[in-house]
Amino acid sequence: MAEVHRRQHAPVKGEAPAKSSTHRDEEELGMAPAETLTVFLKLLAAGFYGVSSFLIVVVNKSVLTNYRFPSSLCVGLGQMVATVAVLWVGKTLRVVKFPDFDRNVPRKTFPLPLLYFGNQITGLFSTKKLNLPMFTVLRRFSILFTMFAEGALLKKTFSWGIKMTVFAMIIGAFVAASSDLAFDLEGYVFILINDVLTAANGAYVKQKLDSKELGKYGLLYYNALFMILPTLAIAYFTGDAQKAMEFEGWADTLFLLQFTLSCVMGFILMYATVLCTQYNSALTTTIVGCIKNILITYIGMVFGGDYIFTWTNFIGLNISIAGSLVYSYITFTEEQLSKQSEASNKLDTKGKGAV
């Protein structure tokens, strides 16, 4: 009998020993802090992007509109130089790491440098031309274009609720634009081009980060580096460089401070965008930008100085804002449900494996 008893309790060869319930509980408790940290990092990345995006719009608006700085290209050039300088110093001091240049780097980054340049310049130009409420409401189109880009490049699908809220945002933008007394055709064209480029840039950044070839610092560095000389050439041949040199505000300390801040914020925003996209998604990054724009819309109405109030325009702005809030809520809840479903499937798979 003793022998039979020993055989019953002896582990079978090739079979893993069963885990005790206490051990399983310890594993589950050990996973909780890691999951909490991941959520915290996602929220931190999203918040960092929102604050950075808010500050750069306000500072750029002040430099280009309030001080009437004549060259959006030169502001963009300053942002590129600041990005390259900060990352080069960081790499030299071994604070950040990214691959050295080789002949494969252009292939690994393409088409991001072109999208980065176009996104930056059209964004600056439209900031100069449009009042802040209309600038922010027309930025809603970037969500629509991001959906198209993620569908085409990342094969993502979107629910009926998401599509309806995006439709509401676009309708609100059209209503607001129909009664925009400060209408500027160039500003409208540039902001819509900027929306397309923002969407394409976000989707491609996610694609490049997933490939893990250059990393976020490498993408930031080489995007800016490759476009410095082309931007300088364009600024020279269009006369923008000459206008910038002849600008009378260089003696103004407050202007110099804001111009420098604009250049540095260009790098910080690029970093925040890549960070938010890495920890979340291109669509989440766009949502955060959208929520930030709500704040800018109302601040621009009161303090912008170039907003002309009409009821139709005001109602259109608020329709778009309401749509963006509902959209953000639906997207967030869908993401949480998706994660819960994935976690449930993993547990089911483990349970079947244990049996």
UniProtKB/Swiss-Prot annotation:
The chain crosses the membrane at residues 39-59, 69-89, 157-177, 185-205, 217-237, 254-274, 281-303, 315-335. GO terms for cellular component: endoplasmic reticulum; endoplasmic reticulum membrane. It holds the Pfam family TPT. Residues 1-10 have a biased composition (Basic residues). It is a multi-pass membrane protein. GO terms for biological process: chondroitin sulfate proteoglycan biosynthetic process; embryonic skeletal system development; pyrimidine nucleotide-sugar transmembrane transport. Its main location: endoplasmic reticulum. Disulfide bonds: none annotated. It catalyses: UDP-N-acetyl-alpha-D-glucosamine(in) + UDP-alpha-D-glucuronate(out) = UDP-N-acetyl-alpha-D-glucosamine(out) + UDP-alpha-D-glucuronate(in); UDP-N-acetyl-alpha-D-galactosamine(in) + UDP-alpha-D-glucuronate(out) = UDP-N-acetyl-alpha-D-galactosamine(out) + UDP-alpha-D-glucuronate(in); UMP(out) + UDP-N-acetyl-alpha-D-glucosamine(in) = UMP(in) + UDP-N-acetyl-alpha-D-glucosamine(out); UDP-N-acetyl-alpha-D-galactosamine(in) + UMP(out) = UDP-N-acetyl-alpha-D-galactosamine(out) + UMP(in). Keywords: Endoplasmic reticulum, Membrane, Sugar transport, Transmembrane, Transmembrane helix, Transport. Residues 1-27 are annotated as: Disordered. The keyword DNA damage does not apply. InterPro entries: Sugar_P_trans_dom, TPT_transporter. One of its GO terms (molecular function) is antiporter activity. Disruption phenotype: Neonatal lethality. Skeletal development is severely impaired leading to reduced snout and body length, and extremely short limbs. The proliferating zone of epiphyseal cartilage is disorganized with densely packed round chondrocytes and little extracellular matrix, in contrast to the regular columnar organization of chondrocytes in wild type cartilage. Chondroitin sulfate content of cartilage is significantly reduced, associated with reduced proteoglycan aggregates in the extracellular matrix. The keyword Transport applies. It is found in: Endoplasmic reticulum membrane. Belongs to the TPT transporter family. SLC35D subfamily. Antiporter that transports nucleotide sugars across the endoplasmic reticulum (ER) membrane in exchange for either their cognate nucleoside monophosphate or another nucleotide sugar. Transports various UDP-sugars including UDP-N-acetyl-alpha-D-glucosamine (UDP-GlcNAc), UDP-N-acetyl-alpha-D-galactosamine (UDP-GalNAc) and UDP-alpha-D-glucuronate (UDP-GlcA), which are used by ER glucosyltransferases as sugar donors for the synthesis of sugar chains of glycoproteins, glycolipids and oligosaccharides. This is Nucleotide sugar transporter SLC35D1. The gene is Slc35d1.
